Amino acid sequence: MVAPWQLWRDRRGRLSTLRIAALTLLLTPLIKAIVQANEIAHGARPLNELIHRAGFWALVFLGVTLAITPFRRILRYGNLIDIRRMLGVGTFCYIAAHLTLFFADQSYDPGKFIHEITHRVYLIIGAIAWIGLAALAATSTDGMVRRLGGLRWRRLHQAIYAIALLALIHYFQQTKADVTVPTFAAGLFLWLMAYRLLAWWQDTSELSTLSLLGLAFAVSVLTFAGEAIGIAIAFHVSPLRVLETMFDFDVGIRPGWQVLAAGFAVAAIDAVMARWRNRTTRARAVAAE
């Protein structure tokens, strides 16, 4: 029997390199903040810096958690599923820290804390996302899976997609000027959702490399379009003028290109893994003869 706190061991009690890697990944932002504690403390707004760090990493780890399903198929490595729960609970820990630090920033005044949240739309959206993640974290144990039943548990945890969307909206709305990173994050989220939708539509667990290339292109186009429309609405300019800058790399690499590069990289990994699996299968067939 593995103790709940022994996160580095798998279900059989063996030391797990994969779990150690996941735990290291989750702890890295915390360790970095501790190392930079003196620098943060002497900054203009230390609590605000920590609030944003915790929120940013919560969003990053939420994306990593959502990426487990497609990547265990693309990498042909089913054991990745073993760290999904750890990543999900780790995501909740960061978003809980995000909210706790915000409470501290309000001088631990419950009235002020509630007033701030209920009078700002992006904070209301963030609070809803937090409540949703809290519900998923509370029901992530094996005991809750048995209590709810497999079907009900899966339906409940499908709420993660809506929660991720709310988290992205919250991130966008609290970003004051440059929306490059939020747009890139939105593009990656769109890819993750589109992957699932395309796999469902094709009724397959593994998309072909060609499908992944098409997916990368389609999602990057939507990312370019979404960014152009968003900037056009925010700054009252033509979206076509925004799109004209997509090839102007002197002003920076637009999120659409970043999403395209990420999508093509995934397709390349899939092609390599497919070829490696075919070679392994042929070698085993020859050995069996």
Named regions from a protein language model:
Residues M1-E289:
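Membrane-embedded alpha-helical bundles that constitute the cytochrome b-like, heme-associated redox core
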